[in-house]
Amino acid sequence: MNNFTYTLEHSDGEARAGQFSTPHGTIQTPVFMPVGTQATVKTLDPLEVEAIGSQIILSNTYHLYLRPSADLVAEMGGLHRFMQWPKPILTDSGGFQVFSLGPHSKIDEDGVTFKSHIDGSKHRFTPESAIGIQEKLGADIIMAFDECAPQPTTHAYTKAAMERTHRWLLRCIAAKTRADQALFGIVQGGVEADLRRESASFIAQQDVPGIGIGGLSVGEPKEQMYGMLEETTPLLPRNKPRYLMGVGSPEDLLEGVARGVDMFDCVLPTRLGRNGALFIPEGRLNIGNAKYAREDAPIDATCDCSTCQRFSRAYLRHLFRTEEVLGLRLATLHNLRFLIRLMEQAREAILQDRYQSFMDDWLSRFQTIPHAVREASRAARLNSLRTQGDKA
């Protein structure tokens, strides 16, 4: 615990500006964390990831356990040395992937038996093994093994999954041996307000230096997700960081910050970038659109990323049409910087007691994606991951 301290610098309503210290550096919050599923942020060199202002990145326990293995990563000196990333790293527990990518997963009180989405081989995770794997990987922040109940489901099943998550957290705490890693507990409870409150109260009582909020942004409407945050965050300790897991659209980041969330991660900006969809203040720009073929303007004239400072929309469209790898890299770099900068601006607004007006002004210009469109895309991605392997 001595290696990890959270300082709440200032609050503006429920929005918080803080600092979380780790052995590999101090993280200023609110913060967006790029996802490096396979110990790499897809298409980018770690130096580029650092240059766009990334303070911390996330890697995935499930995928690294399968390839190249936690033992190999440990043999290579741990994740930081393996991937040459000098700043903090967070690893998830693998629970979400076990339940979402493994349709044949079998859950019991001790753990989960599942089949690899790569070759169908059988594996088993328990709270103890999930902690052991993450200790070998060596991230600064590790997550408790939890059960993310599928949605929609019954109140009874959601309650059972939540209670199992609580019991598993106690086992994770008992199994943890490394003092240089911070173990976060995870609030569950689906979209049931009473369960969210119960879970938040339970996790808040545990001796963990930070708290994740899981099981959201898995198919429910945004308004429901925001409502669950409003049930959850008021019950969490003010002296610990709150991490909303797997959430990364610009509007969700701002709405999450307004409800007291400090940390976010998502593959959305990198995935969208590789598919030619770029964030701009008005929403998303599809670079494949023919109208950009002769447009000499940058993707976003207000953006300070090297893509926008150097290249035109016409050039990026050309790169995507000719399937040049540089196009994927430039789009990924822009999207990540867009979200990182958004959180920098949010932090500044909080410190100046103007967060609500900042958010209202920003969201008044940004066009969001309809729920039905998002859900169709999410379902297609999950099906692809289950049948073809991860391309996140």
From Swiss-Prot:
Keywords attached to this entry: Glycosyltransferase, Metal-binding, Queuosine biosynthesis, Transferase, tRNA processing, Zinc
Pfam families linked to this entry: TGT
EC category name: transferase
Region feature RNA binding, mapped onto this chain: 246-252, 270-274
Residues binding substrate: D92, S93, G94, G95, F96, D146, Q188, G215
Note accompanying the cofactor annotation: Binds 1 zinc ion per subunit.
Binding site for Zn(2+): C303, C305, C308, H334
GO molecular function list: metal ion binding; tRNA-guanosine(34) queuine transglycosylase activity
Function: Catalyzes the base-exchange of a guanine (G) residue with the queuine precursor 7-aminomethyl-7-deazaguanine (PreQ1) at position 34 (anticodon wobble position) in tRNAs with GU(N) anticodons (tRNA-Asp, -Asn, -His and -Tyr). Catalysis occurs through a double-displacement mechanism. The nucleophile active site attacks the C1' of nucleotide 34 to detach the guanine base from the RNA, forming a covalent enzyme-RNA intermediate. The proton acceptor active site deprotonates the incoming PreQ1, allowing a nucleophilic attack on the C1' of the ribose to form the product.
NCBIfam families assigned: Q_tRNA_tgt, tgt_general
Protein name as catalogued: Queuine tRNA-ribosyltransferase
Source organism (scientific name): Herpetosiphon aurantiacus (strain ATCC 23779 / DSM 785 / 114-95)
